[in-house]
Amino acid sequence: LLWFSVWDKNNAFYLGGAFSHLNRANQSFDSDIYDGLYSKFTIHSGLDYIFPYSRFGLSPGIVTFIQGPSLQVNGGVNLKFLLSGNRRTYEAFQFGTWVRLANKVDSGILADALILSTRFDYEQFGIGFSYDMNISSLRQATNLNGSFEFSGIYNICGPERRNVYCPRF
């Protein structure tokens, strides 16, 4: 489920959520024992803002995952640069830093990872790259080695002019 508000061609706000594992499937290997998979709730929100009379903007965001006793929050901000000077094509580059917080098994909140991200958008297509670097006590096991993530983005709304613009997140 996603709700968004578009102020103009470059500025928008979104808020959404999802619910997974509605039927709480049995994850036990023993057919006599029921071990139901916890349902998962996802809540996300963000903003895409271009400064007035500028090609620069900010794209802050947050996503929260809750599944049984587990909690994870990813939050951060990307700095966005509009590359195209004309109104006919949309080209943008963004990069930023995010942090992943999670609850500890015993108690408290743990700053688990620092996430460096970058993205290039052209019209309704985009390609992204991020690197998660472990900053918690788990870094001893990983030697600060993180993980790479690639993403491909396709916005269904095309470039045609509209009275209500499709947001570009």
Tell me what each language-model feature is.
Residues 1-43:
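Hydrophobic, aromatic-enriched interface-forming segments
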Residues 35-169:
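Outer membrane beta-barrel transmembrane domains
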